Amino acid sequence: MAMMEVQGGPSLGQTCVLIVIFTVLLQSLCVAVTYVYFTNELKQMQDKYSKSGIACFLKEDDSYWDPNDEESMNSPCWQVKWQLRQLVRKMILRTSEETISTVQEKQQNISPLVRERGPQRVAAHITGTRGRSNTLSSPNSKNEKALGRKINSWESSRSGHSFLSNLHLRNGELVIHEKGFYYIYSQTYFRFQEEIKENTKNDKQMVQYIYKYTSYPDPILLMKSARNSCWSKDAEYGLYSIYQGGIFELKENDRIFVSVTNEHLIDMDHEASFFGAFLVG
């Protein structure tokens, strides 16, 4: 009878298994409930702070914020506003300092250069040099293929009316630095004085030439102006000046010069004999 009761009830092993299963299920339920609870709380806190921050920027919260009030200082919205204001102020100050520093550097570096150099121009005006023995080229010079005698010496310093800007003078020739169309001009002054004999025809032919040198070996004639003059035998002096000018296309390293006939009649006064060119386009 006793043996039948023992065989009809649950064994000790089965009871232990049931207890373990129940314990595991209970722990799992507790963990799940705890997880759900804390997740819900975190979500509510996030929503609260998110809405509070958005309300600060959207001006949904119209309450007054006193910076000296501890309760206001502990408010999340007040902290957000204060931090944002400080950040904006720092960015504005930094940008202003960088802008002012950059402008000052540019003014210090560029302005003196601009003041010294001034506007960039391409022009030259050179005048006669009275009293120089080597004013004209010798007959056997390399300019023998050019008509007349080349004027070698011109005054190019700024002491008088002369100047050179982005052009330079070499052996009586203006050397071009920049290609373009140039207005070229020249005037030469002729002075005739000698004893006149009767039955002697007093006439002179005066010619002024303007040439250019290119990569081609021979000079190229650009302009010439001529006059036959017969001065009165009763005149103490015979005076005449020839002027000519025109626009020509010149290239870099081209050279232009002036030559004349009757070179012994040339008066190289700096106000009467001159030569020049300037870029027009």
From Swiss-Prot:
- Keyword terms: Apoptosis, Cell membrane, Cytokine, Membrane, Metal-binding, Phosphoprotein, Secreted, Signal-anchor, Transmembrane, Transmembrane helix, Zinc
Renumbered residue ranges of the record's region Disordered: 124-144
Question: Which SMART domains does this chain map to?
Answer: TNF (SM00207)
Stretches with biased composition (Polar residues): 130-141
Which superkingdom is the protein from?
Eukaryota
Q: Which GO terms describe its cellular component?
A: extracellular exosome; extracellular region; extracellular space; plasma membrane
Where are the Cytoplasmic topological domains?
1-17
Q: Which PROSITE patterns match?
A: THD_1 (PS00251), THD_2 (PS50049)
The stretches that face the Extracellular side, renumbered to this chain, are: 39-281
Query: In which broad location class does this protein mainly occur, judging by the first location in its UniProt entry?
Result: membrane
Q: Where are the transmembrane segments?
A: 18-38
Residues annotated for Zn(2+) binding in this entry: C230
Spell out the post-translational modification annotation for this entry: Tyrosine phosphorylated by PKDCC/VLK.
Location(s) in or outside the cell: Cell membrane; Secreted
Membrane topology reported for the UniProt record: Single-pass type II membrane protein
Q: Which CDD domains match?
A: TNF
Single GO MF annotation: identical protein binding
Query: Found in which tissues?
Result: Widespread; most predominant in spleen, lung and prostate.
Protein's GO biological process? apoptotic process; cell surface receptor signaling pathway; cell-cell signaling; immune response; positive regulation of apoptotic process; positive regulation of canonical NF-kappaB signal transduction; positive regulation of extrinsic apoptotic signaling pathway; positive regulation of release of cytochrome c from mitochondria
Q: Where would I find the THD domain in this sequence?
A: 122-280
Question: How is the quaternary structure described?
Answer: Homotrimer. One TNFSF10 homotrimer interacts with three TNFSF10A mononers. One TNFSF10 homotrimer interacts with three TNFSF10B mononers.
Family indicated by similarity: Belongs to the tumor necrosis factor family.
What the protein does?
A: Cytokine that binds to TNFRSF10A/TRAILR1, TNFRSF10B/TRAILR2, TNFRSF10C/TRAILR3, TNFRSF10D/TRAILR4 and possibly also to TNFRSF11B/OPG. Induces apoptosis. Its activity may be modulated by binding to the decoy receptors TNFRSF10C/TRAILR3, TNFRSF10D/TRAILR4 and TNFRSF11B/OPG that cannot induce apoptosis.
Q: What is this protein called?
A: Tumor necrosis factor ligand superfamily member 10
- State the gene name recorded for this protein: TNFSF10
